[in-house]
């Protein structure tokens, strides 16, 4: 049985603050006279402010592979969005500056408040509610949602999962959480810190299913969760698009990043990165 699809317009209307999904970050100067000095000098030559002159500082939740994650062996941040961020930095002639991982649902408030990070990237869906708080760049990738269950599970359809006693894991603050709350109202929706916790919980039988971005769940099933699956009808066509989060107070930076993204698309860089991380263009 196929899952009910929502129109992109309807889906986006429901989504609250927080997304899918995970962005890179660079260390940021604290608020104060030295911070404002860096911002002023950055704006004088570029048309936008930076928390640290000459660097593009980013925050993200680094538990959302293949978009943003930390390499356990090297300790380096990596992923499709990390590579996109570094490519944008190169276009802007800025050095990357990545801050330690943060909770996903703190990203939008942090960028809105300012003073810590310039941008966030990490499979963050553009929604109307989020746009009330921060600005997004133009979209750089399309996405949908998905439901993941354990192979052999008796409950795999939306009707079966939308029942009392069913435990559905989601990452807190994401569009996956919004979709689950709207479409599985009879089930218990369990918000977690990251998608790895959600999928591991399904694997161990703690949860009946999880809902998350399709590119992420597909990647994780291939990499580490061979006993999980996206059941027939489990791909949910929500028509989402990812964008880079920027403060509303920094329109010049949004404009500069949009220009960089356009150049990365036209020169083939985006296609190359998609093939590197997804095996094909999306």
Report each predicted region and the residues it spans.
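N-terminal secretory signal peptides
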Residues: 1-10, 15-26
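Bacterial lipoprotein signal-peptidase II cleavage site
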Residues: 28-41
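Extended ligand-binding regions for polar small-molecule ligands
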Residues: 32, 82-91, 174, 241-282
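Extracytoplasmic small-molecule ligand-binding "clamshell" domains
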Residues: 44-122
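Bilobed "Venus flytrap"/periplasmic-binding protein-like clamshell domains
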Residues: 58-60, 65, 77-90, 146-199, ...
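Periplasmic-binding protein-like
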Residues: 62, 142-149, 214, 218-261, ...
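Acidic, polar ligand-binding/catalytic clefts
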Residues: 95-160
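A ligand-binding cleft/hinge motif common to bilobed small-molecule-binding domains
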Residues: 105, 124-132, 178-181, 203, ...
């Amino acid at each position: 049985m196929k899952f009910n699809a929502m129109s992109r317009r309807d889906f986006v209307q429901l989504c609250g603050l927080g997304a899918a999904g995970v962005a890179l970050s660079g260390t940021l100067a604290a608020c104060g006279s030295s911070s404002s000095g860096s911002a002023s000098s950055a704006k004088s030559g570029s048309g936008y402010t930076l928390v640290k002159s000459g660097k593009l500082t980013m925050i993200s939740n680094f538990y959302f592979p293949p978009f943003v994650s930390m390499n356990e062996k090297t300790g380096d941040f990596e992923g499709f969005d990390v590579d996109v961020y570094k490519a944008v930095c190169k276009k802007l002639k800025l050095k990357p500056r990545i801050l330690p991982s943060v909770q996903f649902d703190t990203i939008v408030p942090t960028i809105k408040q300012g003073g810590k990070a310039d941008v966030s990237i990490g499979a963050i869906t553009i929604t109307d509610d989020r746009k009330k708080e921060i600005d997004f760049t133009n979209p750089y990738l399309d996405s949908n949602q998905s439901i993941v269950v354990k192979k052999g599970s008796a409950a795999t359809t939306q009707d079966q999962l939308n029942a009392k006693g069913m435990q559905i894991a989601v990452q807190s603050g994401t569009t996956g959480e919004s979709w689950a709350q709207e479409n599985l109202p009879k089930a218990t929706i369990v918000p977690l810190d990251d998608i790895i916790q959600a999928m591991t919980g399904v694997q161990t039988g703690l949860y009946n299913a999880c809902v998350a971005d399709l590119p992420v769940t597909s990647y994780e099933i291939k990499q580490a969760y061979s006993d999980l699956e996206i059941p027939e009808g489990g791909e949910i066509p929500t028509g989402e698009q990812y964008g880079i989060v920027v403060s509303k107070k920094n329109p010049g930076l949004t404009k500069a990043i949009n220009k960089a993204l356009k150049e990365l698309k036209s020169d083939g860089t985006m296609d190359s990165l998609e093939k590197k991380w997804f095996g094909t263009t999306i």
